[in-house]
Amino acid sequence: MIAVVSALGMTAVLGGCGSTGSSDVTLRLVAADYGDSAAGSSQKYWDKLVEKYEAQHSGVKVEVSVYSWNDVDRKVKEMVDAGKAPDLAQIGAYADYAAAGKLYQASDLLSIPVQADFLSQLAEAGQVNHVQYGIPFAASTRVLFYNKALFAQAGITPPATWDELEADARALKDQGVEYPYALPLGSEEAQAETMQWLLSGGDGYTDTIGTYTIDSTQNIQTFSWLKDDLVAKGLTGPVAPGKLNRADAFTAFANGKVGMLNGHPTLMRQAAEKGVKFGMVPMPGRTGQAKAAMGVADWMMAFKQNGHAEQIGDFLNFVYDEKNVLAFSREYGLLPVTSSASDTMAQAPRDKDLHAFLDQLTTAQLYPVGKTSWAAVSADIKKNIGQAVAPSGRPTDVLGRIQAAATAADSSASN
């Protein structure tokens, strides 16, 4: 999903709404777990936040159920399908629910200062037909991680262009490094590695008006370069990219077997725990630094089924207070989704480990999550993109098939 940040905050009452009234209301929130152990579960974060909120709002109770990322989207779908939608869900995708008319607009809930504080590209990514339904909750970006010890042994410096990346990978291979560049195009998260490379090649999944451009000339050139200049030359390791999952690539990096790879903030802790000394630089582009980094966001959304718009809005204004946004971001190594918290983090020495990722956020491009077709397109990419760099694969054909399916999915979604 993302390693993304949640802005949990606390604060203000919806402008002009006043108190929540005399009758008790219970809000039900289903949330994803960002912790990597029971001790670090997001449940503890929410429990503490809710305790503070309820102490200030005697007429409102908030019940939070936290599920793993493996289960949370399915759990919410089951609740909605059964006619028992939660008041709030903090999950990975909102567009289908928005298109079905099940969600409140953000402007129906949030105070103007809170709504204006979201980073603009995240707020825009929360829109369906130019109306915001998805409220950004957590964000992350990707940078190029490299193993400092392996680079020193090979006598190389971090790459800034594709040619330099290839030369570095060749030098690492000559030193016996198992994965000079790890290229995880396996089914777990191939859509992320793919998007980072498409951006570094100067294009992406869609154009500026949201039309899929998966088989554009630039994208075909990008995958042709990956196939011919990295994979075919044995610079991506012993596992075929289409069989290599992101989690396995991260583990190999933490075990000192990878020279360089794209990574998000959670890799820092994983590598540090194994004693790997690493550096981080922006993703190289074809002839210089990539024009944009890949960003990922997770979303908060509010269902209309039970009403409670006033209470939901009041709670969300509290959730997105700067102190709460920062607390959540720091706890889980994610990036703030608000300008105020981002500015604070950018100036805070304690957050220096996240500055490389934060620097990428202002120009980051996100998945086209506002398109209801994206879930099907993403699944198709996960399943098939690895074929584009396989020995018998042809990038033109593979990207063309994915584009045709994406166009069809987009057409059915809009009918």
Regions found by a protein language model. Give the residues of each.
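Glycine-centered hinge/linker elements that transmit conformational signals in sensory
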Residues: 169, 175, 211-240
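A structural signal for short loop-to-beta-strand junctions that line the ligand-binding cleft
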Residues: 87, 114-150, 179-180, 290-291, ...
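Conserved N-terminal structural module of periplasmic/extracytoplasmic solute-binding proteins
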Residues: 1-95, 287, 311, 327, ...
